[in-house]
Amino acid sequence: MADVTFISSSIVRPQIINQEGREKIHLTPFDLNLLYVDYTQRGLLFPKPDPETHFISRLRTSLSSALDIYFPFAGRLNKVENHEDETVSFYINCDGSGAKFIHAVSDSVSVSDLLRPDGSVPDFFRIFYPMNGVKSIDGLSEPLLALQVTEMRDGVFIGFGYNHMVADGASIWNFFRTWSKICSNGQRENLQPLALKGLFVDGMDFPIHIPVSDTETSPPSRELSPTFKERVFHFTKRNISDLKAKVNGEIGLRDHKVSSLQAVSAHMWRSIIRHSGLNQEEKTRCFVAVDLRQRLNPPLDKECFGHVIYNSVVTTTVGELHDQGLGWAFLQINNMLRSLTNEDYRIYAENWVRNMKIQKSGLGSKMTRDSVIVSSSPRFEVYDNDFGWGKPIAVRAGPSNSISGKLVFFRGIEEGCIDVHAFLLPDVLVKLLADVEFLEKCG
């Protein structure tokens, strides 16, 4: 177990609190469905800076400037009681209350303890992330963003947790890029003002009214079970090329039409389910988090801030997934993503309002063996975040919202590579690591 000493915890507020036009952000059905979901956790590992640079002070000061631009992260979740129909409504109050900044030290941990050659993730790593067990609805009293800077023996880990109703992966990494730029050069003159996603669901009344009975009692916090194991699987550029060639060989697509993300997702899905101990006739699902920004009609700004994610799903049987091959599995994912339309998103939002079923934890407690959940994206430029003492040497996902089959995709540190941070049941992982067919496509 690693020893972590917490040096300080403070609230960092925006440098300039200008309330004009920033008072309130209404929440869509896509946001409100996450009311009881854990804060999303991610982290970047850096080389250790020279202490003479006073980097902790620089990080804190530049965070204040970054929050002036990304002001929703400095707000709080607010609840309004609608007594006329016994419902409640939620919105983001951009009041400048601030984000949490934690400074910690762990002299007993080195970079090699975290970046193990076999890709395994130590159990103690969870204490390097803030907001463990905190859910979106807790944003009524908790900061919407928390950051923990942990000094290690030979490195620094910046772990963070954020309220997923406020932002998605694209937005949090855009925030990090802005924060790192301000920290490294001290300037913000050329940075663009924040463009919010807006209320992109046409014909819907806001704020949305939710029955009080659905919000009175938060489900108990679900800590990461010790039965789950984490592993980072590294796919080299050659591995990915081989997977895409195999897809082409089975279904005849040209290579440039084969998505690297979808090919690796299909490979992981087939391999994990093959070792999950399910009967051939049982159903299996692959969930994929889809960015709606450019899929809506009209499309949103590519850089707009907010949570703009739709969870799409492919369903088949265990037997069919195994028998039909990698190319077929890829095609199911590809066809599902290509077939999504603006009408699908509109119908989902309208149905959610009519028959509210708030997601309680992750994507459902029953999905421990029969599903995989593909989240994040190798498109996110995680390795470009230089705070002034060098670029990151690794990126990791925290333990929140973890069920077996959760797959968090990151770009690899080498160009063209993909790292998959996987959360699996121990018996599934043991079988996967003995699977030659799986390992020969994984570096």
From Swiss-Prot:
Enzyme Commission numbers on file: 2.3.1.-
Full protein name: Uncharacterized acetyltransferase At3g50280
Signal peptide: none
PANTHER family according to UniProt: FAMILY REGULATORY PROTEIN, PUTATIVE (AFU_ORTHOLOGUE AFUA_3G14730)-RELATED, HXXXD-TYPE ACYL-TRANSFERASE FAMILY PROTEIN
Organism: Arabidopsis thaliana
Top EC class for this record: transferase
UniProt cross-references to InterPro entries, sorted A to Z: CAT-like_dom_sf, Sec_Metabolite_Acyltrans
Family matches, as Gene3D superfamilies: Chloramphenicol acetyltransferase-like domain (3.30.559.10)
Active site: 164, 386
Superkingdom of this protein's organism: Eukaryota
GO molecular function, one term: acyltransferase activity
Keywords annotated in UniProt: Acyltransferase, Transferase
Family: Belongs to the plant acyltransferase family.
Any one Pfam family match given in the protein's UniProt record, by short name: Transferase
